[in-house]
Amino acid sequence: MNKSLKEIYYQDVIPGLIEQFNYTNIHQVLKITKITLNRGLGEASKNNKILEASIKEFELISGQHPLINKARKSVAGFKIREGMPVGISVTLRKKLMYTFLEKLIHLSLPRIRDFRGVSVKSFDGRGNYNLGIKEQLIFPEIEYDQVDQVRGLDISITTTAKTQQEGIALLRALGMPFNDN
C-alpha cells in the first residue's frame, strides 16, 4: 500500500535529515510550516464573475475557502480604489498542506507540458520555495469545460530551513522533482 506524504516524512525523511545534517535534537529537523496559494486579480475590479470563478477554483484546488485580498489604498494609474478586491489567497497547514503537496508533486506537476522538473533557483535563500503555475488546468479538480479563462497562481512553500541547501534537501526528500540545471 502506498504511504501518504506525511507518513513518508515521519518514517523516511526525518531519519535521513538527522543523518545528513547531524542534528542532535528532533526539534531541529526541518519541516514545512505552511503552503500559501495566491492569485492576483487586477481585472476583478471591473468584472465580479472573475472573482467568483477564481474563488470556486481555489476551493476546488485547496479544499478551503480563500481570503479576498483588498486594495489598501487607491491607485489612479491602475483604476483601483481602496477596498476593491485585487487578489485571493489560501494558507494551508497540517493535513490539507500535506494532501495538497502530495497532489502537486505526483499529479499536477507531471501534467505540465514539456515538464522537466522545477527550478532550484526559486528558493529565496532562507529555505522557502516559490513556484509560479501558468495555468490552473494542471490540477485534476479543474475541468477544462468549466474554465472561462486560463489564469495562473503562485505557490509558496514555507519551511523551517535556515539555508537554501537545507530547503532543497527537505523538498527533494519529500519527492519534489527538481531539475539539476
Curated annotation (Swiss-Prot):
GO CC field: chloroplast; ribonucleoprotein complex; ribosome
Subunit structure: Part of the 50S ribosomal subunit; contacts the 5S rRNA.
NCBIfam families to which the protein is assigned, alphabetical: PRK00010.1
InterPro entries: Ribosomal_uL5, Ribosomal_uL5_bac-type, Ribosomal_uL5_C, Ribosomal_uL5_dom_sf, Ribosomal_uL5_N
Name of the featured protein: Large ribosomal subunit protein uL5c
Organism of derivation: Guillardia theta (Cryptophyte)
Family per similarity comment: Belongs to the universal ribosomal protein uL5 family.
Annotated keywords: Chloroplast, Plastid, Ribonucleoprotein, Ribosomal protein, RNA-binding, rRNA-binding
SUPFAM superfamilies to which the protein is assigned, alphabetical: RL5-like (SSF55282)
Localization (cell): Plastid, Chloroplast
Ribosomal protein listed as a keyword: yes
Lineage: superkingdom: Eukaryota
Function: Binds 5S rRNA, forms part of the central protuberance of the 50S subunit.
A GO term, aspect molecular function: structural constituent of ribosome
A biological process term (GO) from this entry: translation
